[in-house]
Amino acid sequence: MHHQHGLFMLALLAFLLVMTVLGTDTGKKDKQEKKVKKSDCGDWQWSVCVPTSGDCGLGTREGTRSGKECKQTIKTQKCKIPCNWKKQFGAECKYQFQEWGDCDPETGLKTRNGNLKRALHNAECQKTVTLSKPCGKVTKPKLQESKKKKKEGKNKEKLLD
């Protein structure tokens, strides 16, 4: 009786071992097939960011890709256009700008150049761009100084209270 019970346990153990090995192999095959399907998909191509309202702030962009076995070929992504972007260059084109040049007395303008730093989402960008602005006195530092004085005055008032 013990001999039959031992053989039964041995057979059961062998069966479980075979099933475990077979289960592992089929799992690997499934994973490899999934990898093949993923590699069949093309790269995502993204449209420009379209603001929800106005010409800056939160918006969306649409992405597309090709491939026979791709489950998802179109998707929408949230994006943001900074409100201080240079509209004529596009939100996806980021430039490194030089310092402003001297004022041209004939045109009344000063200029500076920018070199392309980064093109986001496969955007087509100009390699170099030029900005111009009217010459004039810079009043912003004076405004900042007056704001500091106001803050100092408020702080003194708080200390007196």
Curated annotation (Swiss-Prot):
Start and end residues of each stretch annotated as Chondroitin sulfate A binding: 141-161
Region (Chondroitin sulfate binding): 86-93, 117-125
Disulphides: 41-70, 49-79, 56-83, 93-125, 103-135
Cellular compartments annotated: Secreted
Signal recorded as keyword: yes
Positions of transmembrane segments: none
Superkingdom, natural source: Eukaryota
GO cellular component, one term: extracellular space
GO function term, MF aspect, one: heparin binding
Matches recorded under PROSITE patterns: PTN_MK_1, PTN_MK_2
Tissue expression pattern: Expressed in high levels in brain and eye. Lower levels in bone. In the tailbud embryo stage, it is expressed exclusively in the central nervous system, especially in the hind region of the brain.
Signal peptide: 1-23
Broad class of the protein's primary localization: secreted
Pfam families: PTN_MK_C, PTN_MK_N
Disordered: annotated span: 136-161
Alphabetized UniProt keyword annotations: Antibiotic, Antimicrobial, Developmental protein, Disulfide bond, Growth factor, Heparin-binding, Mitogen, Secreted, Signal
Coiled-coil blocks: none
GO biological process, one term: defense response to bacterium
Purpose: Secreted growth factor that mediates its signal through cell-surface proteoglycan and non-proteoglycan receptors. Binds cell-surface proteoglycan receptor via their chondroitin sulfate (CS) groups. Thereby regulates many processes like cell proliferation, cell survival, cell growth, cell differentiation and cell migration. Has antibacterial activity against both Gram-positive and Gram-negative bacteria.
Protein family per UniProt: Belongs to the pleiotrophin family.
UniProt protein name: Pleiotrophin-B
Native organism: Xenopus laevis (African clawed frog)
Gene: ptn-b
